[in-house]
Design a protein with these regions (language model features):
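Non-catalytic, alpha-helical, charged scaffold/linker segments
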Residues: 1-70, 74
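Serine-dependent carboxylesterase/thioesterase catalytic core
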Residues: 1, 55-175
Length: 175
């Protein structure tokens, strides 16, 4: 396991994280600002905050000094885990809006009497919610019920106006 004691290596790791994640989800930007901070703030500060959030054992000996760079690399690993969460959120929204939503529209067009009921948990809740945003305009929604369990998104996703920026709305406003 390579953990160089070099701030430039931490910065490079943060850059690579950004390349893995691609661009943040502009549509869902109102939900959290954490993804941008994770990729744009000072890497030592970001990774330090993540390291502080995870308990460590057996560090520092009698002086309690510990391994500063080891701690920051532990934080970097936690930051990468968080980034994978953001990436999965983005993916679920894209699949819902660009995949499931249009598919439900085609099913409805083929059989307008069919009643569709959707259920989703965690990222699945996000997927089925964004499917509503991906339904074709016009013919009315074929979805008769939507049940969300512990959805992987903020309730602000449905807001007409975001509390932190009243000029913006949630990505699922009006759903």
């Amino acid at each position: 396991e390579e953990r160089p004691e070099d701030p430039a290596a931490l910065a490079r790791f943060q850059t690579l994280m950004g390349e893995l994640a691609g661009a943040p989800d502009a549509e869902a930007a109102g939900e959290d600002q954490g993804e941008l901070a994770l990729l744009e703030d000072d890497p030592e500060e970001v990774f330090g905050r993540f390291a502080d959030a995870v308990p460590r054992t057996g560090e520092g000996g009698a002086a309690g000094i510990g391994d500063t760079f080891g701690r920051l690399w532990d934080g970097a690993k936690e930051a990468l885990r968080q980034l994978t969460y953001f990436e999965m959120k983005k993916r679920a929204g894209v699949v819902g809006k660009q995949g499931l939503g249009p598919l439900l529209g085609r099913i409805h067009q083929a059989d307008p009497e069919l009643r569709i009921h959707l259920l989703g948990h965690s990222f699945g809740a996000r997927l089925v919610s964004f499917a509503l945003a991906g339904l074709p305009d016009g013919a009315g929604s074929p979805v008769k019920s939507l049940y969300l369990l512990q959805g992987a998104f903020s309730h602000f996703a449905f807001a007409d106006a975001l509390p932190m920026d009243r000029s913006r709305s949630g990505a699922l406003k009006g759903m």
